[in-house]
Amino acid sequence: MFLLGFDIGSSSVKASLVNAESGKCVASAFYPKSEAPITAVQAGWAEQDPAMWWTNLKLATADVMNASGIKACDVSAIGISYQMHGLVCVDKDHQVLRPSIIWCDSRAVPYGEKAFKEIGEEKCLKHLLNSPGNFTASKLAWVKENEPELFSCIDKIMLPGDYIAMRLTGEVCTTVSGLSEGMFWDFQKNDVADFLLDYYGFDRSVIPAIRPTFSEQGRITAQAATELGLVEGIPVTYRAGDQPNNALSLNVFNPGEIASTAGTSGVVYGVNGVTDYDPLSRVNTFAHVNHTANNPRTGVLLCINGTGILNSWMKRNVAPEGISYAEMNDLAAQAPIGSAGVSIMPFGNGAERMLQNREVGCSIHGVNFNTHGKHHLLRAAQEGIVFSFKYGIEIMQGMGMNISKIHAGNANMFLSPIFRNTLAGVTGATIELYDTDGSVGAAKGAGIGAGIYKDNNEAFATLEKLQIIEPVEADRAAYADAYERWKERI
């Protein structure tokens, strides 16, 4: 018995096969081998052809089935993870009407800002937990105003994962978690946000049928089975956006738990047990994969643009030439906690939402030309990145979240002892590092949705925990002092 998981990203589509009994990934593949193209007709625009996702999914599926050597009839369920916030528009024949306006397209910002002001900030935050912002509903408002003939042909709107599920099953449906990320969900009414639809002039009929995140959401059609080399009738039993799915992949389901990534940009995704919001909209809040009205589980999402990109900049411009990241970490470790007074603000990769969309740039403070060297700068860069995470976590704590544990994949900045020890020391949280990824998580989510696993604890019982980092009490005061000095610069 095997589970097939797809991760539909903007750069590639990854497929993984998981043995349901052992919980182990037996094969993975991705397409394309270089980054998928993103079309930018104008500055700030970003579009992709949904048919490209399907083509890449077919190629990845063929590779993963060939590599595994298993029979197609042994695939028991399929799960989907996908890039969040993208808009896909289809007509009554399920034909795509225009390229998808994807997550990093900013053309809809003015529409969301206007809606936030005219509907009322308090109402939006209380009901949507967010500003309408640059999310899917605002993208659709742009289409309505700028492409009215095309808009009149829209039968249903979908997120990227909904589109892939439609291609697999022929059924058009979505989830509460998906609707919440598009700003289509009213948390007070526990229903579609009619007030936002009315404001933008959308008919409720464009919203697909709603299915539970963990449930049968359709079965593979004969045509899809032929295209993918699978068998007809395999159920699709899970779908979620990439950030809630990353949390699921790390077995983050309960209030106080955090899933984090620290690549070029960073993400802190914390689970809250109440439907609360940040009054300054510095973080976003969506329905987590296990959210229900009676047992709320919301995902509070913080993005930090200046994460690994700062570390790579330091490698190119400050570190000795030819040095590896591991060697750079060793050099940085020669500096003490707090980098002997040097502070770096890692905000050089665009506006930061947690700073209320201010674009403050990267800056270096406290350098003494007589006493500081490369090692102080390299350590201060990593500490500055961690301190930006801490600053965001404080916003979450202000929303009533009690942060106890941080789960992360053993990759990118989490490979650095300085980074992970600083994060544990300044937050007081235990850090657990795992070997997993989004497509494997989607496969295990499918196992939950199909009833193969009774719950998440059974599904992730074999999740490999590679390392546990506990805060060192003796160092916490030094981390706290360095953080407070850093925070004075914001």
Regions found by a protein language model. Name each.
Residues M1-R98, P110, K114, C153, ...:
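N-terminal glycine/serine-rich phosphate-binding loop of ATP-dependent small-molecule kinases
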Residues L3-G5, L17, V109, F116-N130, ...:
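Active-site core segments that coordinate phosphate-bearing ligands/cofactors
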Residues G23, D49, I78, D105, ...:
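Residue-level signal for inorganic ion chemistry
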Residues G23, K33-A36, G86, Q95, ...:
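Surface-exposed, flexible loop/turn segments at secondary-structure boundaries
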Residues G44, N66-W103, L129-N134, G161, ...:
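Short beta-strand-loop/turn "lid" adjacent to the catalytic site in phosphate-handling enzymes
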Residues W45, W53-W54, W103, W142, ...:
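Signature tryptophan residues that serve as conserved aromatic anchors
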Residues V206, P212, Q243:
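Extracytoplasmic ligand-binding clamshell segments of periplasmic binding protein
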